[in-house]
Amino acid sequence: MTKRLWRIIIGAAVLATAVLLSLNNEWLQIALFIISYIIVGGDVVKRAVKNIFKGQVFDENFLMSIATIGAFFIGEYPEGVAVMLFYQVGELFQSYAVGKSRKSIASLMDIRPDYANVKKGDELVKVDPDEVQIGDIIVIKAGEKIPLDGKVIEGSSMIDTSALTGESVPREVEVGSDILSGCININGVITAEVTKEFGESTVSKILDLVENASSKKSNSEQFITKFARYYTPVVVIIAVFLAIIPPLVIDGATFSDWIYRALAFLVVSCPCALVISIPLSFFGGIGGASKKGVLVKGSNYLEALAETEIVVFDKTGTLTKGVFNVQEIHPEGVSKEELLELTAHAESYSNHPISFSLRRAYRKEIDNGRISDIEEISGHGVIATVDGKKVMVGNIKLMKMMDIPYFKGELIGTIVHVAVNNKYIGYIVIADEVKEDSAQAIKELKAANIKQTVMLTGDNKSIGSKVAKELGLDKVYAELLPADKVEKLEELFSQKSKKGKLAFVGDGINDAPVLARADIGIAMGGLGSDAAIEAADVVIMTDEPSKIATTMKISKKTLKIAHQNIVFAIGIKIIVLILSAFGITTMWAAIFADVGVTIIAVLNAFRALNVKNL
């Protein structure tokens, strides 16, 4: 950027000298114009020649080169240099805007750690994070970036997660806490055991995601690419006809006059404003979203969010905290302690949130030697042998499948039924909590003209209905198996318009098929969840559903800016193209129609980055 700025300043100074000084020597004046042209336009002509040899003839470099060299041939030296000078000014604005757009992504790129302090004996050795292995012990001092994912084994501190989440409140870590690469250690010294190699760490996955985001083009960007492909050769052909035909068929018409018009026509026709500002708008939108702790994997997904009509939520871990707590224990023929002990052991190998809550409530160490023959039945529960007894833990479906009589009273919460050797021994009531901002999230989505908000859950109807009523959801589908969720999604697809989109929001853990099937898959709690980052199109780094509405606002703002630029740029260019063809405008007006429109469009695109009040 500095190099280009100096070229503009020096080129402008030489041009001003040639124009303002009344030089007696015409050849010296022409020489100054040529020197000025080489300074500001040499690289453009060079690129045009290179592209011609590559078979890429019709681009903005070609248009600028032909128009300006043509101006020199008909003696319009100041205009020829001015076109290149102002083209470079437009490019300068573009590089500045791209630089600013990249800053939020640069704040993400800043999360890449430069080194890791690896403990080797009594010494600390600074090494590249790529060289650190799983199981190595690293030390993170105050003010340093956490280089790799790990578990704290010594010390405590506050860590700044804002670069990943957009949240300013620091998080406390102590012995046993998981720490994530890319966060900053604020005060204490912590020692951690590395749990993932750098290539698989949170920071690497996020950086890879962001770097590849620009490769997925929105419909608006694809339209501009196709438009430029056909538009540029057409205007070159029109310019050639404009320069040759009128002087041959119109009495008194001169070639110099019509060539001048054709050159002005070429300058105006350059599609820079569109080619630059549209991708820049989406790039700015993606950068703005990252400021809010939301990673969008491509412009196509950002655009699709603006067209969303139906938002479907998974319940557990998305609208609710996913932290289940045992509320009640109701044994039949055994003690409460025995019921909980058998249940915790049977569920010990499951990674379901309910299993965690049962083990947490047991509060004792699980003796794995007592457990064998574990069978997890999806959507039903677990069957395991504990102390030689066949223990069945699950929902109503499991009890029905095993033909075991069970408690059928009305209860609010998740009921875990337990049987031993086909004899019912009681049930445990577990409840989840709704997240603080879930109701606000639904309210904001409805305010953003989302036609339907839907919740899918494997829980029973009473729990599903209670949560849906509390949050103000339009529909709820309960008692669903994982496969049923995809089926329900297919039903919901038929309820949206042809252009409308359906978004599914889940925690990214058990939702991969549904996230993949939706038009836009949104994963919550991406911070620390590899599955969320892998599976979704949009990753919300925190556990806040309200950020979905914020991301949609960013999406709509970005799309509005892109459409404004398309209408503005094409509209101005059509008007000035017609005026140029009729000889009503000069080359200077053509320069404004090209460079001026580009600068205005770039500055407008720049607004996509401003997400402070969204």
Where would I find each of the regions flagged by the language model?
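P-type ATPase nucleotide-binding
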Residues: K141, V326, H330-Q452, K461, ...
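Conserved ATP-binding TGD loop and adjacent catalytic N/P-domain core of P-type ATPases
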Residues: G388, V420-Q564, I572
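Conserved catalytic phosphorylation-site environment of P-type ATPases
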Residues: N61-S65, L164, Y260, A273-A346, ...
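Juxtamembrane helix-loop transition segments at the membrane interface in multi-pass membrane proteins
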Residues: V49-V57, Y96-A106, L280-S299, F606-L614
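Bilayer-spanning, highly hydrophobic alpha-helical transmembrane segments
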Residues: A12-A13, Q222-D251, R261-F282, H563-F592
